[in-house]
Amino acid sequence: GNLDQEIQKILLTVDVTQAVVDEAINLKADLILAHHPFLLKGVNSIQEQSSKGSVVSKLIKHDIALFSAHTNADVQLNGTSVEIAKRLGLRSLRPLIQTPVGYGIGVVGETDLSMLELAAALDVNIPQTATGIRGTGDFDDVLKKVAICAGAGDSYLQEALDSGADLYITSDLRHHPALEIMEQAKARGINFNLLDIPHWAAEYVWLERAKSDLESTGLEIEICDIRTDVFNFLINLPP
């Protein structure tokens, strides 16, 4: 966008899609503030007939600026993971990966909740999705320390285990990394478990925090009501 453009209305969203841009146009928003980068991977063309090109064209034609927060929102003190931790009532929060000290990806905090109590609290504090929450462990397990990385976090499975956490909450867990860390925990005699929550839902809660923070500027702030979670049904038949 134009750095000199005057901003009066901001639309907050997790992802930038054609439908989200259409909503921004209808709302007469001046800026879309997204969590995920629009061009997460490079493109060779932005012709209007392509999905990316269509979005770029609409943004330019309607003078709508676009800003993507992503890891800037992940590492801040009121970032994506911290927002989930606060909603779960975790105490003594610290970054999972500190760079620099005091800031970083993910969060680790203390709790006295059981696995069932924490999973239930998580379920009511993130948007409902078709795929829901997947987990390992026993509902009666009493937790002491929980690690969280909002968004795709299986690259930090080792750090979560080494942090002393009983439970790691993240998204997009793949079979092999998850299985390997669980086997490693068993070999070390550690009761370590996982909760896999929907990626979109995990980061949507940050939009509500961002709205609250930005409203102090006097600007008009809207949260996009378009669900960009990819999945819309789940088949889970009994064996």
Where are these regions (language model features)?
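Hydrophobic structural segments
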Residues: 1-239
